[in-house]
Curated annotation (Swiss-Prot):
Subcellular location: Cytoplasm, Nucleoid
Main location: cytoplasm
GO CC, alphabetical: nucleoid
Cofactor binding note of this UniProt entry: Binds 1 zinc ion per subunit.
The protein's name in its UniProt record: Replication initiation control protein YabA
Length: 107
């Protein structure tokens, strides 16, 4: 191998290294963009999970309250008091009780 061939080989190798370096830099930028996007998505996911948990908790509280109120209304409709003053006693002639009605009409 003479000097010219050796120089040409080094020049070709140098050109290949420059192309490879450019490809690596492009990959590096792409990975950096993906890492940033991943971080943003993780934060958004965390916030959405917190919001979903909050909504589920609120929904559970509303459901529990509604079930309890429905149960009391059923007892009242069967002719029994649900108020603190006469709880469990039968209402005479299914008369309305203002204390029981106040409990049922609360929101």
């Amino acid at each position: 191998m003479n000097k010219k061939e050796l120089f040409d080989a080094f020049d070709g190798f140098s050109q290949n290294l420059m192309v490879t370096l450019a490809e690596i830099e492009a990959m590096k930028k792409q990975v950096q963009g993906l890492v940033e996007e991943n971080t943003i998505l993780r934060l958004e996911n965390t916030k959405l999970r917190e919001r979903l948990s909050q909504l589920e908790h609120e929904n559970l509280a509303k459901t529990s309250s509604k079930q309890g109120k429905d149960h009391l209304e059923g007892i009242y409709d069967e002719g029994f008091h649900i108020c603190n003053f006469f709880y469990g006693q039968r209402r005479e002639n299914d008369e309305e009780c203002m204390f029981c009605r106040e409990l049922l009409d609360r929101k």
